[in-house]
Regions:
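Conserved Nudix-box catalytic region and its N-terminal flanking loop in Nudix hydrolases
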Residues: 2, 45-89, 132
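Nudix hydrolase/Nudix homology domain
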Residues: 2-5, 68, 79, 137-177
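Short, solvent-exposed loop/turn elements at beta->coil junctions and helix N-caps
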Residues: 11-12, 106-111
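A generic structural signal for well-ordered coil/turn residues at beta-strand boundaries
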Residues: 15, 20-22, 43, 115-118, ...
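The catalytic Nudix box helix
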Residues: 72-104, 122, 134-137, 146
Length: 177
């Protein structure tokens, strides 16, 4: 079966700083016409950094959920920015650690039902202490947590962030003994 839908029309509803919202008319595989509300986003990066056998976790308030969340260092891609370079930049800006290199752990689609956002996943190598340089609207605490404790935090629902859970899981699966 051909699952692909054909776009018939697209209307920009909202053009924001971070996202654009479109309402598209599509022709479904069964020839029915349907609407798709699509959030277009430039994408982001997520970086797992381990210092002295401890994972760098960030703790920050997330307005959309009205709660403080634990996450791995991450951030938005600038327009036409390479995800590898963005990973290096975000890690240093948010944590004050500079990576010599990043290992590509693939990508994830965090909200595939209604958004085109892609988050690129990396693991940092060759870390050295540098300087934090947070954006003026970022307020982030850094914690260094043993990997076993991170797994426990995921299993207990303390870590809820999808990109963080995804990258930690991929890392553990790739490095299981």
């Amino acid at each position: 079966m051909d699952f692909k839908e054909k776009q018939l029309s697209s209307k920009l509803i909202y053009d924001g700083k971070v996202v654009k919202l479109y309402v598209d008319d599509v022709k479904c595989p069964n020839n029915n016409i349907s609407k798709r509300e699509i959030v277009k986003h430039n994408g982001g990066v997520c970086v797992l950094a381990i210092v002295d056998n401890k994972v760098i976790l960030e703790k920050q308030y997330r307005y959309a959920y009205d709660e403080v969340l634990y996450e791995l260092p991450a951030g938005k891609l600038e327009i036409n920015e390479d995800s590898y370079e963005a990973g290096l930049r975000e890690l240093e800006e948010e944590t004050g650690y500079k990576a010599k290199s990043l290992i590509n752990y693939g990508k994830m689609y965090p909200t595939c039902g209604y958004s085109n956002e892609i988050i690129y996943l990396y693991v940092a190598e060759g870390l050295s202490k540098s300087q934090r340089n947070l954006d003026e609207d970022e307020f982030i605490d850094i914690e260094f947590v043993e990997i076993d404790k991170v797994i426990e935090m995921i299993n207990q629902g303390i870590i809820k962030d999808a990109k963080t859970i995804c990258l930690i899981s991929k890392y553990l699966l790739a490095n299981k003994k």
